[in-house]
Amino acid sequence: MSVYHAAYIDYALRVTENMTDVMTGSETVTLKSYQHFVSRVFLGLDKMHSLLLFHETGVGKTITTVFILKHLKDVYTNWIIILLVKKALVEDPWTYAITKYAPEILKDCIFITYDDKNFHNKFFTNIKTISSRTRLCIIIDECHNFISKSIIKEDGKQRPTKSVYNYLSKNVALHHHKLICLSATPIVNSVKEFVMLVNLLRPKILSNVSLFENKRLVNESELINKLGAICSYIVTNEFSIFDDVAGSSAFARKTVYFQYVNMTQKQEQVYQKAKLAELKAGISSFRIYRRMAATFTFDAFLDKTDKTPEEVANEQITLYKDFETFIKTKKFSEHALSQFKRGQSLGGTSSADDISFLNELRERSCKFTDVCLRILASPGKCLVFEPFVNQSGINILLLYFSAFNISYIEFSSRTKNTRVQSVAEFNKRENTDGDLIKTCVFSLSGGEGISFFSINDIFILDMTWNEASLRQIIGRAIRLNSHVLTPEHRRYVNVHFIVARLSNGDATVDEDLLDIIRTKSKEFTQLFKVFKHTSIEWIYEHQTDFSPVDNESGWSALISRSIDENPTTKRVPHVVKGQNIWYSHSNRLIAVYKGFKTDDGRLFDSDGNFIQTIQDNPVIKIHNDKLVYVLD
């Protein structure tokens, strides 16, 4: 049925044939061809009420959206633009971009922050003041966050944001409004987010039944058939975050490293106490105590049993101040720092004080110590991701930076008033090599809405619960032309996953979280494929045999067809001959997977999903006594 969608895309392009690709305000910008294409389709089809911009970080989805907003009055006279964004993104990029390229629409814009506790009240207060003769254009930036806040909790209680979600899904198409959702990672935590996003864009088209059976999408073709033109898909990096990616003239090369560091005996003892405390408290599934213990340990485990929050807070402050005092009384010699910068260990020519200080730092945190040494040895600027701010997180990490004489900025929840300016200083041309500011340490606050330039090394100190968050974090440093000022031999980004290990070989919390991320990503990859094949770009390129249309009268009926989640066509199992093998997408064997290769060369993963056909004379390497096929 995508051939019919192609006819309407063609119609939109004919209607907007003379639309300029230049946007001028106080400054002028010329849109890239893919930005102009999206804009023409969305503006050329007045009845296209909604569109997802599934664009990877750095390709300019904000500029694309501002261009569309600037040209809304080409379609209709009276518009009010409602931008639903995170508070941190109101000023930059949104107000900044609109003021720069479309200042005339600023008076028609209403910013409402969906991370405000009174968000739903502010939204409906504004809605009541808008004339019924006025059309709305609603922008939802980082829409995965909005969707996440709209999901009903496990206790069945509806979250306030859900009332806004319900209003939009009911009224956008009904009252001839327009909706644009933006995200580089539209699915983050669960498949339910996909269902909710689809039903926001195409109301009631998808029911809440399971889309998967044994981790395989039940009816991919039906979804692709009915969801045609639901999104614009600009994603050049479709690799897993764990895969190496070759560079290009516009993008830096990415290489992934797993840095396994062994906990010290002291750290292991505290880690085991943390594990026991989680079991007693019934919070072992969150792994919070173990995550903190694997990162940093004080001289003793902070047991919260039978203590008031105030007592716990006071004890934490005391432990922190004791460690801070210890750091301030110590200092590495210039000789030691010079060795660290050359990537060398302390040896026979090193002083006893330097060796003792390094051992004491490592005893409390194998991860922080390892990262500091790698930062000093890096030839350029570095990013360090640490999700925890207080306790054993950024608070302590900055003391380690002080000990190793590492210059830094901090982008976290506690630096809201200064962090935007700090990033601007960090990104300055004169700091391309990190001579002025070596490192930016950031929490989850740094995952969205910001860009970093000329980064050479990223250190992931603690895992998030999903690949999407990590992808966004990495994507902030590998963007279109992000390394244009960097010397050619340094146009690369090394991504280091810092993984703590136990001496007895038991899996640590770091290794557990890696497994969780990989399991989730299998289902998400299949849903992202649906978005790709239903995108306006894919349809326009692949569906060329269509009969042109002269109006858009049939568009609404085309996109309103409900999806049959119980198809009559079922998969018929076939028995094939072959063998179990190991395979990897990386020549460096970063991640090795178990699969099945048929006698005719087809490769399937452990869940039965087809991967690719293995060519004659494949590359095979030996890894941990296994023969591993290296895929092209």
From Swiss-Prot:
Q: Read off the InterPro entries from this record.
A: Helicase_ATP-bd, Helicase_C-like, NPHI_C, P-loop_NTPase, SNF2_N
Q: What is its EC number?
A: 3.6.1.15
PROSITE patterns linked: HELICASE_ATP_BIND_1, HELICASE_CTER
What SMART domains does the database record attribute to this sequence? DEXDc, HELICc
Q: Where is the Helicase ATP-binding domain?
A: 42-204
State a single Pfam family of this protein.
SNF2-rel_dom
Q: Which residues are noted in the entry as ATP-binding?
A: H55, E56, T57, G58, V59, G60, K61, T62
Q: Which terms in the GO cellular component ontology are assigned?
A: virion component
| Region named Binding to the cap-specific mRNA (nucleoside-2'-O-)-methyltransferase | 457-524
Location in or out of the cell = Virion
Q: Name one GO biological process term.
A: DNA-templated transcription
Keywords for this protein: ATP-binding, DNA-binding, Hydrolase, Nucleotide-binding, Transcription, Virion
The record places the motif (DEXH box) at 141-144
Gene Ontology molecular function, alphabetical: ATP binding; DNA binding; ribonucleoside triphosphate phosphatase activity
Write out the function statement from the record. DNA-dependent ATPase required for providing the needed energy to achieve the termination of early transcripts. Acts in concert with the RAP94 subunit of the virion RNA polymerase and the capping enzyme/VTF to catalyze release of UUUUUNU-containing nascent RNA from the elongation complex. NPH-I must bind ssDNA in order to exhibit ATPase activity.
Q: Which family does it belong to?
A: Belongs to the helicase family. NPH I subfamily.
The record's subunit annotation is: Monomer. Interacts (via C-terminus) with RAP94 (via N-terminus). Interacts with the cap-specific mRNA (nucleoside-2'-O-)-methyltransferase.
Put simply, this protein is called Nucleoside triphosphatase I
